[in-house]
């Protein structure tokens, strides 16, 4: 057989093989199409028989979990410890433990808009820590030196103080003066001096005796979606929940106090050692960053203990959990101060699942040195207190 015939036969065989592969490919495609039609038909028939939401065939892209990315930093703060954002995200509030121990207000570009502080106190008499902003824009700040939760308007003008589980400063004054507190009266309380200062319109400042209060030392504050205020208390190592109705501006003078409290001192499952922040997930469960126990504990809406997590080894293990924030996807973000990182858990199911961490020890962009608090706005921007680097880092999803 000549070489030309051999070449011709080889080419014919190759063409036949290509045709066979093409035929098989078309057949496989038809089978897949038929299978897809059968699946769609089955789902359609099932829906006709029993109408209900159909299962999702393709995962939605915004349900995929991935770490945020670093955006920028806000400077001009001295040893910051707490951060919060206004409801419209236009203002960032930061508490300082260094310098003058102020609460500073920044815009989103990091420009300083103003500052305020615990009224009637010197530097050594105040120590603002955690901050929470109500839906109406009022700012709630815990002060460790004053053993109180101070309430301000959005511009930092003082309104009132929560002095205990069932007492506000305005309630105390109302009782002390027989309900005859004139409109326009200003007042404040200095716990270190044990004096209430009162100035009525047209009169000079008066000093009144301090209220007789049970010891309490509020630390962490967070609002849930219904406007209830969750407070961690170091005195008895507990979490206390104040109903939204008692916190309205017109209700503070008749403050009715907390509706629920749980927790005690210790290292057992249902106990706390320096609880920092309590937040609520979409199922109403409360998650508490239990600082010195190195874990987060989960409780039901009635204050019954469920479980704890964040212990052990690996990336999911917490060292010193401080501030925490629950986003709309039920992702709990925990500032691990000693771990110099933010750890994130999916708490949408019965048991929390560790997702990822971000950040590490350092002083350059995206690195932390003792992160102490975190909050997230409605646009998915994360504001993280980077205490020893004297800045607020801003990240974004």
PLM regions and their residue ranges:
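Short loop/turn segments that connect beta-strands within beta-propeller blades
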Residues: 107-111, 153-157, 200, 243-247, ...
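A short beta-strand motif characteristic of beta-propeller blades
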Residues: 69-74, 112-122, 160-162, 204-211, ...
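Conserved beta-propeller blade signature
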Residues: 91-93, 138-140, 187-188, 228-230, ...
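Beta-rich, blade/repeat-based domains predominating
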Residues: 75-87, 121-135, 167-183, 211-224, ...
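Blade-level signature of beta-propeller repeat domains, shared across WD40, Kelch, NHL, RCC1
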Residues: 369-397
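Short loop/turn segments immediately following the C-termini of beta-strands
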Residues: 97-98, 144, 192, 234-235, ...
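A short helix->beta-strand "capping" segment at the edge of beta-propeller domains
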Residues: 54-78, 206
